[in-house]
Amino acid sequence: DEGCLPDDSSRT
């Protein structure tokens, strides 16, 4: 989910 979810910014 790269850039799919807003929380993804934390997963980089």
UniProtKB/Swiss-Prot annotation:
One of its GO terms (cellular component) is extracellular region. It comes from the Eukaryota. Snaclec that binds to von Willebrand factor (VWF) and induces its interaction with GPIbalpha (GP1BA), resulting in platelet aggregation. In contrary to bitiscetin, it does not bind to the A1 domain. Instead, it interacts with the collagen-binding A3 domain of vWF. Also interferes with the binding of vWF to collagen. Residues 11-12 form the C-type lectin domain. It is found in: Secreted. The keyword Secreted applies. This is Snaclec bitiscetin-2. One of its GO terms (molecular function) is toxin activity. Dimer. Expressed by the venom gland. Its main location: secreted. It comes from Bitis arietans (African puff adder). Keywords: Hemostasis impairing toxin, Platelet aggregation activating toxin, Secreted, Toxin. Belongs to the snaclec family.
